[in-house]
């Protein structure tokens, strides 16, 4: 969890009383060093978007770890501590279809979009998804092998 330098999740909550400045952020730092940001916006009334930004990417890999950051990004969509059936199965069961991740040179970004805020349990569960993505992946060898093949195919298609 030490490699987690920054947690950025932007929640777009719809409230009955509109805020005057929708671009203001609330932010803070937890005891474990995690920084969070919350921003209200009226763009999607009744829905929230969640982001996890980790300041880790391919830059942190040693030569013998080439592509590992990308593999770990893919592994976030397999079993996690709280979602043994996989995060996508949980999200889709609740009608949430927009979620993804990207690994760059110096960061990895995960997101879950358009989450209904009417259910506080679902809101809490999406925060739990971010928590699991931050360091509670179940790294099963067979899943890692499968994702390595997927990544090879992604690279082949880009060329």
Q: PLM features: residue spans?
A:
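Bacterial Sec-dependent N-terminal signal peptides
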Residues: 1-22
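Active-site-adjacent, His/Asp/Glu-enriched structural segments that form or flank metal-binding
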Residues: 56-69, 74-159
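Short, solvent-exposed loop/turn segments at the edges of secondary structure
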Residues: 4, 31, 45-47, 94, ...
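Mature N-terminal segment immediately following signal peptide/propeptide cleavage
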Residues: 19-51
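Generic marker of residues within folded, mature protein domains
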Residues: 8, 42, 100-102
């Amino acid at each position: 969890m030490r490699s987690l330098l920054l947690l950025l999740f932007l929640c777009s909550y719809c409230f009955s009383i509109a805020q005057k400045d929708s671009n203001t952020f609330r932010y803070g730092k937890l005891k474990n060093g995690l920084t969070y940001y919350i921003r209200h916006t009226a763009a999607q009334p009744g829905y929230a978007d969640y982001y996890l930004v980790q300041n880790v990417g391919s830059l942190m890999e040693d030569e013998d770890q080439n592509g590992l950051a990308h593999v770990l990004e893919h592994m976030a969509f397999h079993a996690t501590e709280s979602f043994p059936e996989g995060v996508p199965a949980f999200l889709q069961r609740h009608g949430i279809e927009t979620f993804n991740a990207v690994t760059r040179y110096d960061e990895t970004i995960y997101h879950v979009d358009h989450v209904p805020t009417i259910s506080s349990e679902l809101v809490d569960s999406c925060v739990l998804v971010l928590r699991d993505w931050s360091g509670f992946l179940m790294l099963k060898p067979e899943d890692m092998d499968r994702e390595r093949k997927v990544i090879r195919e992604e690279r082949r298609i880009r060329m």
